[in-house]
């Protein structure tokens, strides 16, 4: 098996098994499932109660803004962990001040972004 495509064989087998499983599941659901359609089955299910009113409720855009800011700063903070864990390794392999200065610049850019958010009063609820 010196073929250049031989290493892709397990992936192809897994893909075929997955597609086969999906096909068998959908086909058996279609064959064994109930065929009777009624108006009651087309209604929305809301914890056993009949739905009342409009499902569209308006709420403040602040929730989206806070969620976006949380995700933004949370993802950036995730970059701190690998840096902190590997700081000693980087200090031995490269100049330790170089890595420290780069992380300091990264933290400064985060701080500038956070100051911008505060100055724009994005976190004020009034």
UniProtKB/Swiss-Prot annotation:
Keyword Translocase: yes
Gene that this sequence comes from: nuoA
Sequence similarity: Belongs to the complex I subunit 3 family.
Transmembrane segments: 11-31, 64-84, 98-118
Function: NDH-1 shuttles electrons from NADH, via FMN and iron-sulfur (Fe-S) centers, to quinones in the respiratory chain. The immediate electron acceptor for the enzyme in this species is believed to be a menaquinone. Couples the redox reaction to proton translocation (for every two electrons transferred, four hydrogen ions are translocated across the cytoplasmic membrane), and thus conserves the redox energy in a proton gradient.
Subcellular location: Cell inner membrane
Enzyme class label: translocase
Entry's Gene Ontology cellular component terms: NADH dehydrogenase complex; plasma membrane
Name of this chain's protein: NADH-quinone oxidoreductase subunit A
Entry keyword set: Cell inner membrane, Cell membrane, Membrane, NAD, Quinone, Translocase, Transmembrane, Transmembrane helix, Transport
Catalytic reaction list: a quinone + NADH + 5 H(+)(in) = a quinol + NAD(+) + 4 H(+)(out)
Assembly with partners or alone: NDH-1 is composed of 14 different subunits. Subunits NuoA, H, J, K, L, M, N constitute the membrane sector of the complex.
InterPro entries cross-referenced by the UniProt entry: NAD(P)H_OxRDtase_bac/plastid, NADH_UbQ/plastoQ_OxRdtase_su3, NDAH_ubi_oxred_su3_sf
Membrane topology: Multi-pass membrane protein
Single GO molecular function: NADH:ubiquinone reductase (non-electrogenic) activity
EC number of this enzyme: 7.1.1.-
Coiled-coil features, chain-numbered ranges: none
